[in-house]
Amino acid sequence: MNNNNTGSHAPETSPSRRTFVKSMSAAGLGLGLAGIARPSRAQAPAAKPGRAKILKFGSLGTDIHPATISARAFADIVNKGTGGAIDVQVFPSAQLGGEREVAEGMLIGSVQGMSLTLAVLGNWVPEAQLFELPFLFRDEQHALAVMSSPIADEMAEKFTPKGFRVLGYPIGGIRHPMAKFPINVPADVKGKKMRTIQSPLHITLWQTLGAIPTPLPPGEIYGGMQTGVIDFFDNAKSSYWDMKWYEVAPYLTELSHIYTFSAFTIAERFWQGLTPEQQKVVRDAAGQTSLRHTQLVLEDDSVALKKSVEKGTKVIVADRKPWQDAMTPIWTQFGAKVGGMPAIQKVVAYRG
């Protein structure tokens, strides 16, 4: 991926992401996960008074969530690598607001960074919703290969004119339905209130299945399930455990219908205020910690499901065919917004 000042040149490949896909592929997506260190809160070197550039970096996750862990690792690398000239301050648990609020904050200068889902960034670059299409990816290996390819690098270039500098694509999670009731087939969600993210694609997707989309931030899911504001939602297994959603949504249907990738994003206005040397430190740190984020998510998903089952979660392994038949027609509906059917087929056919 090209991350120079102008953003006008052809994208270059991120070596760290390509290496990760190759190594994960070689070991069935499992190589090296157990040895990933979980960093403590970053301690930045002291900067000269009045000289430090403040980089407020948001995270929706708690302190133990992969997004926050990797954000603190990013802070540590940047703070030390710039000798304190950049002071990265991490704000977990949505302290800076939801994704939409943080993205808007980047544009006005109140926030400088966050790993934002492509679904939310699709409000500014509709083509980014390409990677959110249901059943677009065959499996984890296919998804990771595509997101470390020129296809994803070219997408990153589209964000720069909109005010966002995309420096990596950590996986945010693999979505599965989580509910108060058993979900086996698409008809099971008809008439049910479904918590969605603030994405036109996600809202439309569940509307086509007869559900009633109800956009809510992650922090309101637990209460929404308790009070009946929503009946079900979809999310990653790691978040299901971390947020204790198993207490209010005892049924988890393994579906893997959407692979949610985030864009490691720095506000373009902040990026342009950095020296070339500082940009390199930030760019390299983003690459390293996007890799860390992905590794932790894949590791945590496996562990989280086991822990949730011990707490009473009932896991349903659904037949994917009826869901594919019900969901993939949205490809045609959103095709024009994501670059046309050729763009979709390019991803489907990608082999790495």
Regions found by a protein language model. Give the residues of each.
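N-terminal acidic, proline/glycine-rich, low-complexity intrinsically disordered segments
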Residues: 1-7
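Short beta-strand-centered segments that line the small-molecule binding cleft or hinge
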Residues: 145
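N-terminal secretory/targeting leader peptides
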Residues: 2, 13-142, 150-352
